[in-house]
A protein has these predicted regions:
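The first long alpha-helix at the start of the GST-like C-terminal all-alpha domain
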Residues: 205-207
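Iron-sulfur-cluster electron-transfer modules
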Residues: 1-139, 144-203
Length: 207
């Protein structure tokens, strides 16, 4: 990235660095902290999803969220699922025999807690085509920590994913990301750039 720029600047990363300086000087904003807790919100949603979804539709609650957290009152938050993709996969029985290929599913926090059907459909299509699917332990890719330039939290969030995914790609598994393009970009581009375990992160990026 940046090669097409006159001065070969990777502008998105330049902005991230600028945000990092701002965060270092002023600290994290409340909405940055809130939006980075995707795994925690997903866990709460698995227990209290219907209640949280109902409350999020109340205009006065959205008004308070706008004033306190900084999430615009007209912004509709994605609904939380009580049956997470992780729960579904644990109970899922694969019928694949003699697979033609094998993949490790990186579900993303969005697929796990919000759009579970997306993950289910991906697995069903892959298995229909005789592809073995595994879903190892994982957490949010860490992208929400990059927006404010919180590199320490990003590394803390991403390192366990790298260690786990590396085990599988070393066995010949390919990575399938089900979820927002930001998550794919994070694994492919941000992990190699921002994490110190460069060999493992690069292997994941190429898978």
């Amino acid at each position: 990235p940046g090669k097409e720029h006159e001065f070969e600047l990777d502008f998105p990363k330049l902005m991230t660095r600028a945000q990092a300086i701002r965060t270092k000087d002023r600290g994290l904003k409340l909405n940055d902290i809130f939006l980075s807790k995707t795994d925690l919100l997903g866990t709460l949603g698995s227990y209290f999803g219907p209640l949280i979804n109902f409350v999020n539709r109340i205009s006065i609650v959205r008004w308070f969220m706008d004033k306190i957290i900084g999430i615009h009152k007209d912004r509709k938050l994605p609904e939380l699922a009580t049956l997470t993709f992780e729960k579904w996969f644990k109970n899922h029985k694969s019928v694949v025999q003699d697979p033609i290929d094998k993949v490790v599913i990186f579900g993303t926090c969005y697929t796990n807690s919000n759009d579970v059907d997306l993950g289910i459909s991906a697995v069903e299509i892959l298995e229909h085509n005789n592809v073995e699917c595994v879903y190892p332990k994982q957490q949010c890719c860490g992208a929400p920590h990059l927006s404010p330039g919180d590199f320490d939290s990003f590394k803390k969030q991403a390192d366990p994913n790298v260690e786990e995914l590396y085990k599988w790609v070393s066995k010949g598994y390919k990575i399938i990301v089900t979820g927002p393009p930001t998550c794919s970009l994070t694994l492919k581009s941000e992990y190699p750039d921002y994490l110190e375990m460069s060999d493992k992160a690069q292997k994941i990026s190429e898978s």
